[in-house]
Every structure is written in structure tokens, then in C-alpha cells.
């Protein structure tokens, strides 16, 4: 892959090939190297949670590493990313919803387009979901002791609903969603304590 990429670079496609090379290199350094310490513990917890729902060990391994990569890249708690993913798709890469949400993080096509990711690409979906979650944390994370909860509600209902109701909207789906994410997060957090 790297040789092919560098050959293309010499044929005039240097910038695109160089960006791809850097991406592959960075991913290999941050995700594929053996994990140590706290990262290994987080990996084990996320892998265990993913494997409870998704019995494919290769996918679960990849998902756990991708969550840690997205977490480090966008400064979002990896347990929160995993809790949202568990609630959204139960770690199923091909998940879809009647409303049109796609993939592991259940991105809506318009949201994915506005972020600039392909929602059908599992890594793009995780990165897009993490960016969207980071945006909601930036918007609502400072709303007192319930800031993270409000950000999670915004991930589900959209930020407009949060502004309209000055907090978590009265939608049953959103209120249930917040409870499910909180429950998943606390389960993951407790797994880290052992």
C-alpha cells in the first residue's frame, strides 16, 4: 500500500498520496501499536462491551481501537463515545434506522455531509459521530452539572431542540436515550474500576 502510494506521488498526485500516507502512518502509530497502561484498560473495556453485542472479534477489536483513536483525536471521553455507540447501534457496523440514520454512531446523511465524512465508512462514521458529539459538548458542556447530559440529548434531538426548550426537550425518545447512554456509560466506567 505504501509503495503504491509513493509511486502515485511521483506521477503528479503528490499531495493526495502524501495525505493518504500520513493518515495511514498516524493511524498505525496511534491505533495499531500495542496499547499500554490506561489505554489498554480502556481498550479491554470497550472491546468487552462491543463483543457483548457484536460477536465478531475482528470487528470488536477494530471498533475498540477506532474509538480510542477518535477519542484521542477530538478530546472526547472514549467511554462516552462507546456509550453513545452502544445506545445508537449496539456496535453493529451496518446499523440503520427508519429515520435514515446510518452506521455505528447513527449519523444522519445531512449531519455527515456537514461534517465532511462518509457515514457508510465505519471509520468516517465514528469520526463524524465523535466530531458531532464534541460539538455538542462544546455547545452545552458548560451548562452546569447537567452539561454532558444536555450534550448527549443534543446528539439525539439536535441542538435546535435544546435551545428551543432551554435544556433537554420533553421528547420521550430523547429522555429515554439520555437514560440509556448514562446507564451504558456507568456500566463502562464501573468495568474500568476492576
Write out the residue ranges for each language-model feature:
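Membrane-interface motif at the C-terminal end of an N-terminal transmembrane signal
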Residues: 32-38
Amino acid at each position: 500500500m505504501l509503495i503504491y502510494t509513493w509511486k502515485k506521488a511521483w506521477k503528479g498526485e503528490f499531495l493526495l498520496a502524501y495525505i493518504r500516507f500520513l493518515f495511514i502512518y498516524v493511524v498505525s502509530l496511534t491505533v495499531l501499536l500495542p496499547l499500554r497502561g490506561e489505554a489498554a484498560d480502556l481498550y479491554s473495556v470497550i472491546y468487552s462491551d462491543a463483543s457483548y453485542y457484536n460477536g465478531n472479534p475482528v470487528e470488536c477489536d477494530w471498533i475498540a481501537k477506532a474509538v480510542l483513536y477518535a477519542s484521542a483525536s477530538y478530546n472526547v471521553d472514549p467511554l462516552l463515545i462507546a456509550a453513545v455507540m452502544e445506545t445508537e447501534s449496539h456496535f453493529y457496523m451496518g446499523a440503520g434506522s427508519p429515520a435514515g440514520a446510518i452506521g455505528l454512531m447513527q449519523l444522519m446523511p445531512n449531519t455527515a455531509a456537514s461534517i465532511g465524512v462518509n457515514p457508510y465508512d465505519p471509520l468516517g462514521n465514528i469520526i463524524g459521530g465523535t466530531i458531532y458529539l464534541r460539538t455538542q459538548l462544546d455547545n452545552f458542556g458548560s451548562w452546569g452539572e447537567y452539561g454532558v447530559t444536555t450534550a448527549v440529548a443534543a446528539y439525539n434531538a439536535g441542538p435546535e431542540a435544546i435551545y428551543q426548550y432551554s435544556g433537554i426537550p420533553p421528547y420521550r425518545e430523547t429522555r429515554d436515550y439520555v437514560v440509556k447512554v448514562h446507564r451504558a456509560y456507568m456500566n463502562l466506567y464501573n468495568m474500568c474500576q476492576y
